[in-house]
Amino acid sequence: MNTIAPNLDGKHLRIGIVQARFTNEIGSEMLKVCCRTLQELGVADENITVATVPGALEIPIALMNFASSEKFDALIAIGVVIRGETYHFELVSNESGAGVSRVALDYNIPIANAVLTTENDAQAIERIEEKASDAAKVAVECANLVNLLLEEQFEDEE
């Protein structure tokens, strides 16, 4: 059996991050943690590009434009959706998540989805460190995996 080991070496990877500004205090902290973790994994600061958008529903369009540029090995979505008193929470959560997944599959690019969906601010704050750090690790690991699989695919065609 062939097994591909996880590779968390971010050296030479280019990462795009889209952060929703709605609930910006939490999102900004997530962005800091995410960027710090990427750098700890070896991603050069000049290889990290950050764009901000108004809210979670706008994340997929920015990700799509990053993906279509073919300048990135992986992308990261950062944001916070906190339940209110209306159905709007479900709409935003579901549509944002579906859009992120659609971009990843349509453009064959790994996207780490760190859009938190919580009941309140306290739950979101509690998850900042873990979820933002995890997103960086997922992006690096999946970028390396996809790059390796693409290399093997092209080697097989030769």
Curated annotation (Swiss-Prot):
Role played: Catalyzes the formation of 6,7-dimethyl-8-ribityllumazine by condensation of 5-amino-6-(D-ribitylamino)uracil with 3,4-dihydroxy-2-butanone 4-phosphate. This is the penultimate step in the biosynthesis of riboflavin.
Family statement: Belongs to the DMRL synthase family.
A GO CC term attached to the entry: cytoplasm
Residues annotated as transmembrane: none
Disulfide bond annotation, renumbered to this chain: none
Binding residue positions for (2S)-2-hydroxy-3-oxobutyl phosphate: E85, T86, R127
Transferase among keywords: yes
Catalytic activity: (2S)-2-hydroxy-3-oxobutyl phosphate + 5-amino-6-(D-ribitylamino)uracil = 6,7-dimethyl-8-(1-D-ribityl)lumazine + phosphate + 2 H2O + H(+)
Enzyme Commission no: 2.5.1.78
Gene3D superfamilies: Lumazine/riboflavin synthase
GO biological process, one term: riboflavin biosynthetic process
Active site per database record: H88 (proton donor)
GO molecular function: 6,7-dimethyl-8-ribityllumazine synthase activity
InterPro entries named among the record's database cross-references: LS, LS/RS, LS/RS_sf
Protein name: 6,7-dimethyl-8-ribityllumazine synthase
Pathway: Cofactor biosynthesis; riboflavin biosynthesis; riboflavin from 2-hydroxy-3-oxobutyl phosphate and 5-amino-6-(D-ribitylamino)uracil: step 1/2
Domain of life: Bacteria
Keywords in alphabetical order: Riboflavin biosynthesis, Transferase
Family annotation (Pfam families): DMRL_synthase
